[in-house]
């Protein structure tokens, strides 16, 4: 996980602007969630289920990090779904993820 993205996620966590799992979905339904991170090692069927639910709520989703990496940020074992509930932080995280994807494509 890239350090800058981890720092932004930590900032959202310290500010209390995050939710996990079903709570993230509840926040999405209430219009609070601005971005959802789904761990890349989540099973394909669960990824599809989460993406469908968040897409229905009009919340962008990114596949990023592993369950353990996301869990580490919250001092938990593993986290599959994390919502960022602050627009500016979500925008910056999304921008950095896109840059990381572009850099990965250029290296291949």
Residue ranges and their predicted role:
Residues 26, 43-44, 88-90:
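Glycine-rich nucleotide phosphate-binding loop and flanking beta-alpha elements
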Residues 41-42, 66-69, 87:
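Short, ordered loop/turn segments at secondary-structure junctions
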Residues 4-38:
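N-terminal first-folded block
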Residues 22, 40-41, 84-85:
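Fold-independent oxyanion-binding glycine-rich loops
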């Amino acid at each position: 996980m890239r350090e800058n993205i981890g720092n932004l996620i930590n900032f959202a966590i310290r500010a209390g602007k995050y939710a996990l799992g079903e709570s993230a979905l509840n926040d999405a339904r209430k219009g609070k969630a601005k971005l959802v991170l789904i761990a890349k090692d989540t099973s394909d069927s669960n990824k599809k289920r989460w993406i469908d639910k968040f897409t229905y709520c009009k919340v962008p989703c990114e596949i990023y990090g592993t369950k353990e990496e996301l869990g580490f940020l919250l001092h938990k074992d593993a986290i599959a779904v994390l919502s960022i509930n602050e627009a500016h932080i979500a925008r910056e995280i999304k921008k950095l993820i896109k840059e990381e994807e572009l850099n990965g494509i250029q290296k291949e």
